[in-house]
Swiss-Prot record:
Residues 608-789 form the Lon proteolytic domain. PROSITE patterns: LON_N, LON_PROTEOLYTIC, LON_SER. Keywords: ATP-binding, Cytoplasm, Hydrolase, Nucleotide-binding, Protease, Serine protease, Stress response. This is Lon protease. HAMAP family: lon_bact (MF_01973). Its main location: cytoplasm. SUPFAM superfamilies: P-loop containing nucleoside triphosphate hydrolases, PUA domain-like, Ribosomal protein S5 domain 2-like. Transmembrane segments: none annotated. One of its GO terms (biological process) is protein quality control for misfolded or incompletely synthesized proteins. It comes from Syntrophus aciditrophicus (strain SB). Signal peptide: none annotated. The lineage of its organism: Bacteria, Pseudomonadati, Thermodesulfobacteriota, Syntrophia, Syntrophales.
Length: 790
């Protein structure tokens, strides 16, 4: 950095210096010249050298003026309009020419001038100028304060700046003229040329002092901030050097004592673990590569802990450690029957897998999906399967999972990265062939972080999961020996590609008799023990259990049933603890004392009391249920109103039913002109619950026919089926759940589509015997059976 050197003394003659009327103008771009200052200049180009030569031949005077654009080496030296109008006249003290059209000048500032007009532009600029005389200023307290403050600030700048010599501070304090002090400091400080030109053009000395004070103060703030940053950096460097020095000393002390280096010990331990672990070849190479990286790191570095965490995961996974499967099929069957009543289809599939495994030991594990309402034993059955197989059990819940990294893990580049939940589960199971339950697979979500269901495609595909790639591990892990069991309430929300990889086993709701046996065999003993009671202290009669099932619960599973049994057990436990009784035999008459009045009263038959009401059957994620359809007519203009939160499919079914009745009005017994001045309103009660699906078509049509023919639908009859405009009755799903719901409600007759006859095989024989099933193919058959005679 070139710093202008002020004169050691202010030449008094400069105050009476006479400025020529015409001056040669040299444009300058990177600096601003001030009076009283002496500084070197480098010039390049023949025209600049020619300008200086002519000035040297005359009076050695030049006008230095700041230009807004850099002077051109070719063409005009500068456009006149680019020049500022205030400059400094300087005297050339020394000229030293150099090779290559270069020269160096030493000049001294004499006085400010203002350009009056430009006279010539070629070969260089000449202008008529006038001298700017310095104001006569009488020092007052404000001027003295401004000068003192400026000198103090400048002194602090000198101390903080590595490029400015300390002599400048003493020189500034020796200057008595306010204008000279402002000019000299402006030429020295590291300010922009625009700011310096502003100081040059400020003729009011008081204002000039204020302006240069602001500039110096800003420069001081920058220097102080830089000094603070430098101090912090130096402290960090000193601490690092100190830590390094202490570690080296500690290392030397340990060597003198014969102790091994901690890093070497840890590396040796990991090497031993890797060699002893039965890793795959790919995993072994990756582990040794990471170990080699770790051996070159300092134990205090962040990367060192990342490497140790990775090696901990690699060496703790059960790469080839498996449990021995139970080959005794009879014992496995006994265990399954001990833990669960019914569920024959799921048990049969597990026994088949065991049989195949016994004949072909290297067979891959099945990927099952248990689908059914809540409380039907999906998760507990998976635990029972693990016990029957003699395997470890692990479960993760996928409900609400939105991040793909939950399945595949995070890449090691991220802070706090870990493997996904699949690999974490395998590690915790400590076996490469556990029974692995993915609970609530139908409730997996997706968002901007990825789609977990897509990541599960690799996990649940037997053709791919032998080389499952977790992002954190970075090596393939064999999942083909894992028995994956997924659970869901419905299949509709599972993506088709994922559903295709699952072997679906439906676990429908239980019948009343099945619930009774489950309560007697499992629920009552479990709650009795959970509440600290013995078999002698509490007993349930069969009538009491039946009343709890029918009067206090209405569900496909047995979860609420167990809660009600637990409530009775707690009530008895309270009485025994208070000394009121020593034991209790719970009969049907006693239930209301513990559970209150009966909550579930079947009013299905009473609800069908007049024309326009029909009873249908619905299937929901929680099991089957009754669905009532109500229809009414009023004067209007052939309008159809649908209420009850119906979905699009149900609305279309209602429109199809009305169109069928209108097109077959004569056959059904309805006047043809009846619809011309009539509005129809169809309502499905429980309006707060959204409803959709095609299976209510026959129920809607029956309700409309009942209304328009003024014939009631039989009150012990329910129906389900999809309809077409031609009156055909098409098959629907969920037959078992719907039939069981009707059976619980005491319905005796059910109308089913003809194509659903095959589904009766899944219904317990006791239920089939107690109910009458009518299979139809056409809506006319439905109306003949469902509508009572006039």
């Amino acid at each position: 950095m070139e710093v202008p050197m002020p004169e050691s003394t202010i030449n008094e003659d400069s105050k009476i210096f006479k400025l020529p009327e015409i001056l040669p103008i040299m444009p300058i771009f990177h600096t601003v010249a001030f009076p009283k200052m002496m500084f070197p200049m480098d010039i390049v180009g023949n025209r600049f050298i020619q300008l200086v030569d002519e000035a040297m031949a005359k009076d050695r005077l030049l006008g230095l003026v700041l230009t807004r654009k850099a002077p051109s080496a070719e063409g005009p030296l500068c456009q006149c309009e680019d020049l500022h109008r205030v400059g400094t006249c300087v005297s050339i003290l020394k000229l030293a020419k150099q090779a290559g059209e270069k020269a160096q000048l030493v000049v001294q500032g004499l006085a400010r001038f203002r350009i009056v007009e430009f006279l010539e532009e070629e070969p260089y600029i000449q202008a008529r100028v006038e001298k700017i005389e310095a104001d006569i200023l009488i020092k007052d307290l404000e001027i003295e304060a401004l000068m003192a403050n400026l000198s103090t600030l400048f002194d602090r700048v000198i101390k903080l700046s590595p490029f400015l010599p300390q002599e400048f501070a003493a020189m500034a304090k020796s200057i008595q003229e306010p204008g000279d002090l402002a000019d000299i400091i402006a030429s020295i400080v590291n300010a922009s040329v625009e700011d310096k030109q502003k100081i040059l053009e400020t003729l009011d000395i008081r204002q000039r002092l204020r302006e240069i004070t602001l500039i110096v103060n800003h420069q001081l703030e920058i220097l102080e901030l830089g000094s603070k940053i430098q101090s912090q950096v130096q402290e960090d460097i000193d601490k690092s050097q100190r830590d390094f020095y202490l570690r080296q000393q500690l290392k030397a002390i340990r060597e003198e004592l014969g102790e091994s280096d901690e890093n070497r010990v840890e590396v040796a331990e990991y090497r031993k673990k890797i060699e002893e672990k039965m890793l795959t070849e790919e995993a072994r190479k990756e582990a040794f590569r990471e170990l080699d990286r770790m051996s070159r790191m300092h134990p205090a570095s962040a990367e060192y802990s990342v490497a140790t965490t990775y090696l901990d995961w690699i060496t703790s996974l059960p790469w080839n450690e498996r449990t021995q499967d139970n080959q005794d099929i009879r014992q496995a069957r006994r265990i399954l029957d001990e833990d669960h009543y019914g569920l024959d289809k799921a048990k049969k599939r597990i026994i088949e897998y065991l049989a195949v495994r016994k004949l072909k030991p290297d067979t891959k594990g099945p990927i099952l999906c248990f689908v059914g309402p809540p409380g039907t034993g999906k998760t507990s059955l998976a635990q029972s399967i693990a016990r029957a197989l003699g395997r470890k059990f692990y479960r993760i819940s996928l409900g609400g999972v939105h991040d793909e990294a939950e399945i595949r893990g995070h890449r090691r580049t991220y802070v706090g990265a870990l493997p996904g939940r699949i690999i974490q589960g395998i590690r915790r199971a400590e076996s490469s062939n556990p029974v692995f339950v993915l609970d609530e697979i139908d409730k997996v979500g997706s968002d901007f972080r990825g789609d977990p269901s897509s990541a599960l495609l690799e996990v649940l595909d037997p053709e791919q999961n032998f080389a499952f790639m977790d992002h954190y591990l970075g090596v393939a892990f064999d999942l083909s020996h894992v028995t994956f069991i997924t659970t869901a309430n419905i299949l509709d929300t599972i993506p088709p590609a994922l559903r295709d990889r699952l072997e679906v086993i439906e676990l429908p709701g239980y019948t009343q008799d099945e619930k009774l046996r489950i309560a007697e065999r499992y629920l009552i003993p479990r709650q009795r023990e959970a509440n600290g009671l013995t078999p002698e202290q509490i007993k349930f009669t069969r009538g009491a259990a039946r009343l709890i099932i029918s009067g206090y619960t209405r569900e496909a599973g047995v979860r609420n049933l167990e809660r009600e049994i637990a409530a009775v057990c707690r009530g008895v436990a309270s009485q025994i603890a208070e000394g009121e009784i020593s034991s209790a035999l719970i009969s049907a008459r006693d239930i209301h004392r513990y559970l209150g009045p009966v909550r579930m009263i079947s009013d299905a038959r009473e609800r069908i009391s007049k024309p326009g009401i029909a009873m249908g059957l619905a299937w929901t994620p929680t099991g089957g249920d009754l669905l009532f359809v109500e229809a009414t007519a009023m004067k209007g203009r052939k309008g159809l109103t649908l209420t009850g939160q119906l979905g699009e499919v149900m609305k279309e079914s209602a429109s199809a039913a009305l169109s069928f009745i209108r097109s077959n009005a004569v056959k059904i017994g309805i006047p043809v002109d009846f619809f011309e001045e009539t509005d129809i309103h169809i309502h499905v009660p429980a309006g707060a619950i959204p409803k959709d699906g095609p299976s209510a078509g026959v129920t809607m049509l029956a309700a409309l026919a009942s209304l328009l023919t003024n014939r009631t639908v039989k009150n012990d009859l329910a129906m389900t089926g999809e309809i077409t405009l031609r009156g055909l009755v098409l098959p629907v799903g969920g037959i078992k759940e719907k039939v069981l719901a009707a059976h619980r409600a005491g319905i005796k007759t059910i109308i089913l589509p003809k194509w659903n006859r095959k589904d009766l095989e899944e219904i317990p024989s006791k239920v089939r015997k107690e109910m009458n099933f009518v299979f139809v193919n056409d809506m006319r058959e439905v109306l003949n059976i469902a509508l009572s005679r006039k």
